[in-house]
Amino acid sequence: MPKLRSATTTQGRNMAGARALWRATGMKDGDFGKPIIAVSNSFTQFVPGHVHLKDMGQLVARSIEAAGGVAKEFNTIAVDDGIAMGHSGMLYSLPSREIIADSVEYMVNAHCADAIVCISNCDKITPGMLMASMRLNIPVIFVSGGPMEAGKTKLSDQIIKLDLVDAMVAGVDNNVNDEQSGEIERSACPTCGSCSGMFTANSMNCLTEALGLSLPGNGSMLATHADREGLFKQAGTQIVELCRRYYQQDDESVLPRNIANFKAFENAMSLDIAMGGSTNTILHLLAAAVEGEVPFTLDDIDRLSRNVPHLCKVAPSTPQYHMEDVHRAGGVLGILAELNRAGLLHEDTPHVLGKSIGEVISEWDITQPENAHALEFFRAGPAGIRTTKAFSQDCRYPTADTDRENGCIRSRANAFSEEGGLAVLFGNIAQDGCIVKTAGVDESIHVFTGRARIYESQDDAVKAILADEVIAGDIVVIRYEGPKGGPGMQEMLYPTTYLKAKGLGKKCALITDGRFSGGTSGLSIGHCSPEAASGGGIGLVEEGDSMTIDIPQRKIGVDISDEVLQARREKMEQSANPWKPVSRERKVSLALKAYALLATSADKGAVRDASKLED
């Protein structure tokens, strides 16, 4: 029978000092011997997805205490990728994931906590907490802050839905006047919550459901809706139950490495492909797998991407549907139900509710008339009122969206496309693979040949695009922006947004060893591995080279012979500063240099290179 980890600090005369300190936090005699549960919150006023989380930790804590546990809350950092975008702040985004993971590990292990409730929401916070949970392997439940409502504005006498990317595009589109741009900007992000499309934050919160580590509705229930309060309360109650099962009944099935096992990672990736999630999710799933010693690799993702259809199309891939529409259609469990009916899901994987994922799907599938509670739950919708407050409205759609032929979520027979929304490409510039979000690529450019335009920083590429130096048929190559080369693997949302604003969204491609925002669409290929700074082939492409992208064949490369490529490699190796940008002025802080020293390329999740830390 496993002993409570917290007993190390609460039991025995020699721990009198520790108990004295625990008492100073509010603990009483009767609390020593109860499970001490860490509530890892991520409240900050910098991030709309986290601005409403201040009271959520205490909401969970009171629920934990009512169920018989002791709750202790702490906070992690949280970076807003949208605000950090387009300047040197973006260098810090991905490295913050490792700091979040480390901070959770530090707090939980330093104080010998018995379990964790992770209150996350935006881009690097959920992945960082997931990585920590897989490292620690103690009972955990995730509960996110939820997505924001879609923005809405009236243009040409029509009400249209908006998100952050619409504001960015309008800001540089010469066809949009100042008044229209200002209206879009003021309307794009109307409430607290993670940005309203299937961007990185919402994608990751959806994936925690598929991994079995969060409750039904976690990925799709709006931040503003009153029903979301129930998820926080239930998380507090259920984590105490998981502690009871593990510490009192020796039930190891409740541990995250047993719930989020290899099959669960396949389920999560299948969901990601089916819903056309952010390419960043691949990076984060691979990182979590490494931390949990789960043998899930890019090869598995490549295999799944060839078999899983695209069942749910959401902004930025279409303006028609946002997360509130996904929720109305049955949320994550609605998509998983269609995957299950298509024979593309492992329905026997465990879940934090103590059931299999298949059982949870059956209970929450809105296409089954007997699930009246699910139909009511998934009718929760937006109020259309600007607010930063959680649980501030209780509006409901008249009906749920159960249309699997033409609705937001489709059956396999009515899929948006037979192949899913993400693909892995290989070739001489990405020997270990690269990623494209096919859900956002027009079919007319699934095969594309163009002229390489080489830029060794995102800033230089942006200047060239805005100066109209990039023309139709060009392939913009941005390199030395990987985890090590950036350092920090910046998101390239501004270059792709500006290409779209210039009318080049279907006429150009962008290839990088950096990454993309979940808001990116178009022929945008990232995560080229190995990255240029690690000797990757992307570092050998020259200005004016012909390059070819072939999504159906999963191929990408520069159109030169192996002999020419090898000659370029030898020349690079013999240069004064091999595998470094030739003319880039960028001040890199000591903190970022420390990150770069251990960073692996994207195909390994950009985690630390453990081989460099071996005894």
UniProtKB/Swiss-Prot annotation:
Highest taxon listed in the record's lineage: Bacteria
Signal sequence annotation: none
SUPFAM superfamilies per the UniProt record, alphabetical: IlvD/EDD N-terminal domain-like, LeuD/IlvD-like
Pathway membership, UniProt: Amino-acid biosynthesis; L-isoleucine biosynthesis; L-isoleucine from 2-oxobutanoate: step 3/4; Amino-acid biosynthesis; L-valine biosynthesis; L-valine from pyruvate: step 3/4
Keywords, in A-Z order: 2Fe-2S, Amino-acid biosynthesis, Branched-chain amino acid biosynthesis, Iron, Iron-sulfur, Lyase, Magnesium, Metal-binding
InterPro entries cross-referenced by the UniProt entry: Dihydro-acid_dehy_C (IPR042096), DihydroxyA_deHydtase (IPR004404), DiOHA_6PGluconate_deHydtase_CS (IPR020558), ILV_EDD_C (IPR056740), ILV_EDD_N (IPR000581), IlvD/EDD_N (IPR037237)
Cofactor notes: Binds 1 [2Fe-2S] cluster per subunit. This cluster acts as a Lewis acid cofactor.
Keyword Magnesium: yes
Active site annotation, chain numbering: S517 (proton acceptor)
Cysteine disulfide partners in this protein: none
Gene3D superfamilies (alphabetical): IlvD/EDD C-terminal domain-like (3.50.30.80)
Protein family according to the UniProt entry: Belongs to the IlvD/Edd family.
Protein name: Dihydroxy-acid dehydratase
Source organism per UniProt: Pseudoalteromonas atlantica (strain T6c / ATCC BAA-1087)
Annotated gene: ilvD
